[in-house]
Amino acid sequence: MDEEESTERQMQIAMLCQKLAMMKQLFNEDDTDYINQAISSNSPDTCRTFLSNLEKKGNPQADPSLLSKLMDSYTRVFSSMPLGKYSQNESYAKMLVRFAELKAIQDVNDAQTSFDIARSHCKDFAFVHVAYAQFELLQGNMKKCTMILQKAFEMNAKPRHVLEAAVRNLKTGKRQLLSHEDKENLSVSALDHTQGSRRSDGTCELKPSNTFLHSDQKFSPQEENGPVWRTGSQHRRTAMAERVPMVPLSIPENETSDSDCAQKAEAPFTHSSGFSRQTSGSSVRSAFSLCSSKKGTPDGDSYSLNIKPPVISPDYLREDIEEGHTITALLNRAEKRETARTEETTDINQIISTNSTEGCQAFLKNLEKRADPHSDAAFLSKLLDCYSKVFARFPLAEHCKTESYARMLVRYAELKGIEDPEDAADDFSIARSHCKAFAFVHIAHAQFELSRGNSRKSVSILQKALSSNARPIELLQTAIRNLKSGKTLLLPAEHQESSEAENVEAQNGMKREENPVKAPEDHQKPFSKETSSEWKIPALITKHTSPEDRKAPVEPVSSSSSHHAVRTPAPLRLNPSLSCQTPNYRQPNPNSFVTPVVKQRPVIVSVPATAQKMCPTALPCTPQSGVSYIQPPTQTPSSAFSNESITIKGKQFFIFKMIGRGGSSKVYQVFDHKKHVYAVKYVNLEEADAQAVESYKNEIEHLNHLQQYSDQIIKLYDYEITSSYIYMLMECGHLDLNTWLRNRKTVKPLDRKAYWRNMLEAVHTIHKHGIVHSDLKPANFLIVDGSLKLIDFGIANQIQPDVTSIMKDSQVGTLNYMPPEAIKDTSSNGKPGSKISAKGDVWSLGCILYCMTYGKTPFQNITNQISKIHAIIDPSHEIDFPDIPEKDLLDVLKKCLVRNPRERISIAELLDHPYLQLQPQPAPEPAETSSSDFKRILNELVALQSPNSIARAASNLAMMCNSGRKLDVSECVKSSSQTLWK
């Protein structure tokens, strides 16, 4: 026993040594101090230099730890340098591009989202468009690659010769849009720009060089090491308290009480760094010229910029800069911003607390008049957040019959269309299915589809609205007439005004009654030129306001003004003092001004994840959206409640993230009020054909019927079917078998055997109930708590118990797992067809087991599809079965992959196969023990004084008895004697 304890102590010592070694390695490799220094410099140039040097330490494609460290570092940089402030800085744009390229190593879809964000916000840089086009070209999307480059010319991205070179290379069929020489020239140009315009000493004086003054140069650099003069509270406010969860405009200047918000892109920079002596307008466009005279600041060391933006006059911008000449003025300004923000949050909460959907609609409508959501990304995100708060307070099932609620649903969908038309289509479908009694809901959806070029669907929506008896019918008839006449606007503005005038008057009356003191101020507040009806017309989704329209709401307003003058609350989806967000997670329309939005999905440390609209507290998100099937252990729903929810039969579920999509369906990870996690499959029946709708309904029927028969079928807890959508509330797993196999080079024998049994049991269950799957593949199985479960029925077909096979009018299945009989032509009477049966599922399962054994499918090495089909059905083509130690496994593989289905083994036989049976060891014959042996053992036990020693000796004796071995008295005595020396 001494040896055992000694061995245990040695193991503990070894573990401690290992931990110390890991800590030492971590200490040596820890770049925290360096990244902190780079971030504290407030210089994208410095941060990019640090990240470039960090990447040179290895190969991110081959080193996951380096890739993770790089992603974390980019995350921290983007958290501290919001996109809205630095998007016009060249180094920042290059960091966005490189981040997207690194994301492509992890997830192509996330990389595409990151490229979209970079292109929509840094559209003046040609290299951003070229990098995105290169990414799409490598994915094989030639058409999208061409479109991106064409859009870059339309956006007047510079330098133009880079775009021209990329187009030339694309037309000549080259895989690289920019040659190595072109990239070097681009890098040298950027380096000259950075070095020539950087301050030469620590006096914060800017030395403009010839390079900086050159007309082709777009931006002055960001300062690196300006002395920072700010209090601790101001540090905290800048770093954390004003971090906006959905929009990375996290610094005070974009949260001011001024209504110009994001339109004043340069002046806020002075405010954000108001306690540091630095040059103003560090990211000014090339259209701005540098003045030689200096501003009359107390220090006299900062240059003013003669800014001539198209929206805000230079005088207005300079006046705003001059307000911050003294620290006292800046402190007062910061305090006003903080007070205004508190009042804004309180104001929206007060409106919601009135339990009036009419009041909420009036507030949101008036709020929207303060800026243009089409061109102001920050304002758009705040509007969406306000709508989300309203919907969270007023459940859809209870208020869908209210006109004001229906109008809010419609306007929310229209605003979502600016960010993501796909999400907007879903929101329109939800609004139309729940508020079908209102004609304007159907017309808005039809207008949205018409604006996307789907005139056929627009007609279908209006026809269904007529059949559903939506009111007023006159509006529908007008919309149909306008559609048939070829007009792009289904309803003129006067129709919108007349249909809503009565409702608006009632809302205004309610507001005057609730806010009698503020009513005069509402009257005085100047609004934009947008008419009261204009906001409801879906066709205006892609409208960009003119500079004249945008000037109207620029006038600063007091923080104590009415609802019209109240700033939109920061979209605090979580704890407002802790949330840190960065450019993130959308799949935006390339033609829209896209807010870098986190789709409310929880972030996994070092590998940030693609939800759906959920962001965790105190963890910065990165500009990407990785769809992670693994739930982070530290993330709890209680700390991350989402404002986006799904209601299924009156029960509300909050969206974590989207974990999958395909065709007309999407799968979300959700949780309820009790923090139970589920998966919700949403199917948009508007986009599905009749056959797809029928297959979805069959899937629900099968799942619902088979719940009681097997634990290897995914659990279906509830579902809701309407004419326009389907909700399926199901069990949520960790990851599918296909992903699990992709992440492993080899599979452990015990895991393979356990998963094989799970698959057989699941398929055996559906076969017993007359269901043939006919498209089994690893992606059809989900790992839930260490067990495999069948998650769908593919192209499942129910057959009668006395029928062995059925005929299909086309070949079905996935080729690498498709049985020969499903490929062979069994046409009759000139009608093509193929045969499927339960034995076909056995072949598919055999291919999965083959993949788990050899790391590939039987015919995976044949790349030509025609040759692969011939090999599958050709009996003379022998399937390779390399020798393996498990002979029973080899026998299973050979019997599953028999081309003749009649000779192929059945599921029932596979369950009884020796491969799945435990191989019991022959039990040893019990040996007789003499009475003298017992006597010696008992005497030895009596001689022991220590209770621990007696217990150990008795334990050894029991182990000998249970093992069936003959009792070794000397061994027992030896063990007992050893304990006496302890």
UniProtKB/Swiss-Prot annotation:
Residue ranges of domain Protein kinase in the record: 653-916
One BP annotation, GO: male meiosis chromosome segregation
Coiled-coil features, chain-numbered ranges: none
EC category: transferase
Active site positions: D775
Binding site for ATP: I659, G660, R661, G662, G663, S664, S665, K666, V667, K681
InterPro entries for the chain: Kinase-like_dom_sf (IPR011009), Mps1_cat (IPR027084), Prot_kinase_dom (IPR000719), Protein_kinase_ATP_BS (IPR017441), Ser/Thr_kinase_AS (IPR008271), TPR-like_helical_dom_sf (IPR011990)
Keywords: ATP-binding, Cell cycle, Cell division, Kinase, Magnesium, Metal-binding, Nucleotide-binding, Serine/threonine-protein kinase, Transferase, Tyrosine-protein kinase
Biased composition (Basic and acidic residues): 510-533
Tissue: Barely detectable in adult somatic tissues. Expressed in immature germ cells that have not completed meiosis. In ovary, expressed predominantly in previtellogenic oocytes. In testis, expressed in primary and secondary spermatocytes, but not mature spermatozoa.
Keyword Kinase on entry: yes
Induction remark: Strongly induced in a subpopulation of cells in the proximal blastema during regenerative outgrowth.
Swiss-Prot/TrEMBL catalytic activity: L-seryl-[protein] + ATP = O-phospho-L-seryl-[protein] + ADP + H(+); L-threonyl-[protein] + ATP = O-phospho-L-threonyl-[protein] + ADP + H(+); L-tyrosyl-[protein] + ATP = O-phospho-L-tyrosyl-[protein] + ADP + H(+)
EC number of the protein: 2.7.12.1
Molecular function, one GO term: metal ion binding
Listed GO CC annotations: kinetochore; nucleus
Region (Disordered): 178-204, 211-230, 493-574
Cofactor(s) the record lists: Mg(2+)
Mutagenesis / variant outcome for changing I783K: In zp1; temperature-sensitive mutation that blocks fin regeneration at the restrictive temperature
Keyword Transmembrane: no
Record-linked Pfam families: Pkinase
Compositional bias annotation for Polar residues: 211-223
Observed phenotype of the null mutant: Mutants show anomalies in the chromosome number of male germ cells, leading to aneuploidy and severe developmental defects in their progeny.
Family: Belongs to the protein kinase superfamily. Ser/Thr protein kinase family.
Physiological role: Involved in mitotic spindle assembly checkpoint signaling, a process that delays anaphase until chromosomes are bioriented on the spindle, and in the repair of incorrect mitotic kinetochore-spindle microtubule attachments. Required to prevent chromosome segregation errors during meiosis. Required for fin and heart regeneration.
UniProt-recorded name of the protein: Dual specificity protein kinase Ttk
The species this protein was found in: Danio rerio
